């Protein structure tokens, strides 16, 4: 729908929504054109600002947390003004939904582009994207702000190829509770060791995440993506820094850049300003080298949408002839409470569809996913069904399943009674497991069998901590729902 932008150029540049606009209903200020995608925090729509004709993105977020925290984070976004950070124009609070109006980046996220093209990026493309990303991080860190969710899904490109940081301070960090639920615990693959260990962290935590993102762009997915997120939580602080699967494919400069990012000690990790002087970044080419891959990705998206529409039209004809009989080419939508039918999508839902890797990365990683045909609702905004339960993070479903298993099987207790002592079962801080050589086979087998119950106990502690933080927030929401207003 880029023709809308070309035929109706902005009459003036939108910098910020004025007070008059913020007192109106959002539908009076914007015309929604289409749904762009779905993220872990809600839906994203493409819209046009009626007064200026400017294209914007609107993220509709169901608010399940402390409104005061959200307002505080939005005030932080209002302070940011950089060409390398997605601009924030204003917000509307309507019922229990937060509508966030932001800068529109027509090419989508780097993660989207990788998935659509079915290709990883070249070193030149990665260097150009990293250069813009580092400039954005340098700005945020100069403002003493931490992004906390750097990954390919949160680096957006406009149609000219300029990379911009997204989901800073608003949808990516609504509150500590939501951030830990959807970022730290739900997708730990990009998180710095000090963040996972909760020992305090500063701006260079973003640099570790940037190093992981560099590997993600090169290989299609981050390290540890093939294992359960909860296991990754314990492995990242303990194991040596990750590196490329096939180092021989990459230049010394690129590998050294990643090495500088992935230093486990925060005090010794490079800053954004220092990394902008790294040879790999200083030799980066202009954004024009990204235009071909952007055009290719947008062409693929358009062709898929056209093909999907043809399938829908064909199936509609078949359905009209068969009078509500299911077509053999259609499948029931999982979890569809309305019982409607949709065409089976041929797109992979994972973060990686490259041939050399399996599609094992969990799909709900907080990265916007491209629409399937059934998600398109004629460009209208759709309010969240209040009867629907919010999607559970994968690790909570994992908890619940394990709890059921533990009720049936008391094996964990039996094993724990036979352990030598609790100190023997702690993960060595230096990663040295030489002491295992002195253990008997029987002791080793007991240790192996006891690992899962131990992990369940540690996860239960995390869950209890989550609950203790969540309940006061829920109580506060009830009090603040009576004060619905635009801001």
UniProtKB/Swiss-Prot annotation:
InterPro entries in UniProt: Kinase-like_dom_sf, Mst1_2_SARAH_domain, p53_tetramer_sf, Prot_kinase_dom, Protein_kinase_ATP_BS, SARAH_dom, STE20/SPS1-PAK
Cofactor: Mg(2+)
Binding site for ATP: 36-44, 59
SMART domains xrefs: S_TKc
Reaction equation(s) it catalyzes: L-seryl-[protein] + ATP = O-phospho-L-seryl-[protein] + ADP + H(+); L-threonyl-[protein] + ATP = O-phospho-L-threonyl-[protein] + ADP + H(+)
Broad class of the protein's primary localization: cytoplasm
PROSITE patterns cross-referenced by the UniProt entry: PROTEIN_KINASE_ATP, PROTEIN_KINASE_DOM, SARAH
Annotated positions for site Cleavage: 326-327
EC number, UniProt record: 2.7.11.1
Compositionally biased tracts (Acidic residues): 313-326
Disruption phenotype annotation: Mice show progressive hepatomegaly with a 2-fold increase in liver mass relative to total body mass at 1 month of age and a 3-fold increase by 3 months of age.
Family from the record: Belongs to the protein kinase superfamily. STE Ser/Thr protein kinase family. STE20 subfamily.
Name the UniProt record assigns to this protein: Serine/threonine-protein kinase 4
Organism: Mus musculus
Lineage: Eukaryota, Metazoa, Chordata, Craniata, Vertebrata
Gene: Stk4
